[in-house]
């Protein structure tokens, strides 16, 4: 949820943010009206409760002659208080709905526009020049790494098996990511992948993108599409001590996405699938530290990409392509030779205080135990995921159909070269 102080002091800033996202700026006026109505309802209810309390005291001290009139007034006030409390509850509900409808306020400098309006911040390496390159699925099948056919037989479209050295390649990649995270002060975590509705909603994934989320109806639980979700809920309703700096966690989990809005897109291979594995960095910090921490997350992502030795670019994602929780997002996109374009491998988002406000995650300024709790900031960033296999296989392929294993992954895979294998049963 957005900061009400900003809304009240500078509503035009929130309107501009909505417009840059391509979202409805009139929602800002609806929230302002709901905020005013809520405060008025609270004031009315408080006034009536105070009058009711005073009237109750008067009844006790009244003479027999005065008591009937005072009792009648007390009864009338009780009915008015009940009605006022009902009106307050309705106003609170309307306010909460209006508050939840507004996306995070975009940070100044984020490009306006939609998916194609990003700004390129950096390009690293030259696009790999290959004559008649094979795509990652052809390579994965010929090398005995990926089995889409049996994945579809067992689970349906957009499922797969990683087999043999394909499994080792992914496990090595994720272990490398976790190792880098630990070296930089992250606490490794293996979180639950089923979460309660309030946690999923708190991270902002039950709004416009609710159809992308798997729900276990019998238990009223959701399968997570990223370990960002359970890690954001980890400190819900807590007051943190950030006096020693940010709290950093690295979650390793399977992730699940319905891809309901992606019909017909990336149907070949493991670019867009229903289940994948990922190491996700998640950070709690003070709002003042958030932008610097965002740059640090991007730096660690770039370090991981350097280790897998692929050309990539960094983009500043346009406001209209941001999720509702993100105030700014950087993507690192690797070159995919068979598509002759860059595809997203990592994203890192600065969610400012948006998620923490929903989840009631606070900190005490300066670590002062008596200080007033403040809303924390949260950030997240991919450190390694299944999709990276696409970039590794395609960029390191050789004319004979083999694939060179990036040096950093050789100890995990057990070989420097992946070579075609014969068909198996």
From Swiss-Prot:
Binding site for ATP: 257-259, 273, 344-347
InterPro entries in UniProt: aa-tRNA-synt_IIb, aa-tRNA-synth_II, aa-tRNA-synth_II/BPL/LPL, Ser-tRNA-ligase_type_1, Ser-tRNA-synth_1_N, SerRS_1_N_sf, SerRS_core, tRNA-bd_arm
Disulfide bridge map: none
UniProt keyword terms in alphabetical order: Aminoacyl-tRNA synthetase, ATP-binding, Cytoplasm, Ligase, Nucleotide-binding, Protein biosynthesis
Pathway the protein takes part in: Aminoacyl-tRNA biosynthesis; selenocysteinyl-tRNA(Sec) biosynthesis; L-seryl-tRNA(Sec) from L-serine and tRNA(Sec): step 1/1
A molecular function (GO) term: serine-tRNA ligase activity
Cited SUPFAM superfamilies: Class II aaRS and biotin synthetases, tRNA-binding arm
Major location (coarse): cytoplasm
Nucleotidyltransferase recorded as keyword: no
GO cellular component, one term: cytoplasm
UniProt-annotated location(s): Cytoplasm
Binding site for L-serine: 226-228, 280, 382
Function text: Catalyzes the attachment of serine to tRNA(Ser). Is also able to aminoacylate tRNA(Sec) with serine, to form the misacylated tRNA L-seryl-tRNA(Sec), which will be further converted into selenocysteinyl-tRNA(Sec).
Domain notes: Consists of two distinct domains, a catalytic core and a N-terminal extension that is involved in tRNA binding.
Subunit structure: Homodimer. The tRNA molecule binds across the dimer.
Similarity section: Belongs to the class-II aminoacyl-tRNA synthetase family. Type-1 seryl-tRNA synthetase subfamily.
Protein name: Serine--tRNA ligase
